[in-house]
Every structure is written in structure tokens, then in C-alpha cells.
Amino acid sequence: MKRVYTLCIITCLVMSLFSFGIHKITREDEKHLKVGFIFVGDEITPYTNNFIKARDHVKEVYGDRIECVTIYNVAEGQVESHLQELVDEGCDYIIAASYGYGPDVKAIAEQYPDIQFCVPTGDNANSDPVLPNYHNCFGEIYQGRY
């Protein structure tokens, strides 16, 4: 009977170590993402504050697997240098949260096909040139009608 208990304990230990090893390998393979945000305002403007809340939620959910770089109070028409700054910092994704940023962001996206760019509320993703790394998005826009 002692032999059965010993064999059972050894099997449990081996399985535990194997499980831990698989978990460690899986965690090491997870990609660390760097996301850049450009906002037209700051936390005192409701429009920008909603994006800040979304960014904070993403940081909370993904923890140390995501790094966020944020630039506030960028006027439309002055976004190009800030986009370049985020590219130079090595951002994998860049979210420029103002409708007026659209044309400038698309021009930069054309130069950097390995970086994903998104302009919430934008409308030019499907106009020429259509780029695989440039996106527009809307939230649940119907809610504004009520």
C-alpha cells in the first residue's frame, strides 16, 4: 500500500511541475503590446474622458502585457509630429481619438504598414487608398439618440 501512495505522490508532483512549466512557457510567449493614445483634450472634457476610461480598463484587464503611452491636448492639424513621436517610441497600435486627425493619421499609416492605426469616429478608412493597417470605429452610436 505504501508503494501505491508513494507512486501517487510522485505522479502528482511530476504533473504539478509539468503544469507549472507549461504555464511559464505560455506566459513567456505572450506578446507585450505598446499602445499609443493621442487625445484632443484631457480628463476634464467628457469626450476625451470616455476614451481615458476605456484605456484604463484595457490596462486593468491586460495588466503588464500592455504599455500605454498617452499624449493629451493635441489640436487637430498638429497631430503629425505626435504620431511620429509614438512611432519612434515603438508603439504597436496608435489610437488617435479625434475626427479631425483622420487625414494625418492615414498619411502616417501609409508610411508604417507594421503599425496599426485607429481613428475613432473617423470615416475615411474605406476611401482610397484603403490600408490594411488603418481603421475607423464607432461605439454603440445609437445610444446618442436617446
Where does each model-flagged region fall?
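Hydrophobic alpha-helical
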Residues: 97-111
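Hydrophobic alpha-helical segments within soluble ligand-binding/sensing domains
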Residues: 134-146
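Periplasmic-binding protein-like
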Residues: 37-38, 91-99, 116-120
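Secretory targeting signatures
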Residues: 1-24
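Immediate post-signal peptide segment of exported/extracytoplasmic ligand-binding proteins
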Residues: 25-34
